Amino acid sequence: MAVRRRSALLLAGAVAVPVVGIGGYVAYSGSTYSQGWRMGQLFKLSNRRSWQRLFMAAGEGELSLGQDSSRAAWAGADGQSVQNPWLFSASVEQIAQYEPLLGRSVAVRYHQLQKKLTAFHGDTDYRIDEIVPVGAGRPPVGACAVSGRGARSSGTRIGRIVKSTVKGTLAKTHECTVQVGNSGNVFLEMSVPNEAMHDCVTASLLSGQPVAISYVENIIRNPLNRDTNYEIVGIRPVES
């Protein structure tokens, strides 16, 4: 299922130039390391000041990934620390705009800054672009598949997709995170082979529903192309 493309802003110094977004996301040339969606329960939004920004507040938020997960931290496939809940920064105006969504299951579209400007612009290097309720008014997720190559094992997992991202500087990779099962703190990182499957992964995330994810485990992995040995080759809806 194709995700709707939208226009974006190209940040060049202090000048914003409209361009076509990459994979449906806002693109900031030279300033963005990753961009994508995360799904879960929105349970905190706040405005706060620090000694670096005494005269202006910055918005901060927390998203508990998936359904009924708890506080945890672990090392991701790329070696970076992953935290649940996921912390993000926003403008004061965005905090007010999205406050009615507190306590609901939502999808957050974000971009991650290449260079941290946390001292004056927020506590994190993640900036939100929009927050939407999951599932509301969206068509059911359809089945999608690609062929897998070089596999030494294969299988299917049932779970919710809680993260869909495009990341990297010169070489871009498509990655996702799956909450295995119906709830809890078991998260599995997987790589996405192409943009068509990435669109399907993102559509599954926006639905908020569990899906059956078919994958192969590749013997050889090019780290420039993907973060994990697990490659998604098919997604289909789970009958309730």
Identify what each model region corresponds to.
Residues L113-G142, N218-S240:
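OB-fold/S1-family single-stranded nucleic acid-binding modules
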Residues G13-G21:
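Core hydrophobic alpha-helical transmembrane segments of single-pass membrane proteins
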Residues S7-L10:
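N-terminal export leaders
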Residues V82-Q83, S89-R109, E195-I213:
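Short nucleic-acid-contacting surface segments enriched for D/E, G, S/T with interspersed K/R
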Residues S34-F55, R152-H174:
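Structural detector for short beta-strands of small beta-barrel domains
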Residues I22-S34, R138-S153:
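Short boundary/loop segments of OB/S1/cold-shock single-stranded nucleic-acid-binding domains
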Residues Q52-N84, A171-M190:
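OB-fold (S1/OB) nucleic-acid-binding surfaces
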Residues M1-V3, A16:
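Secretory targeting signals
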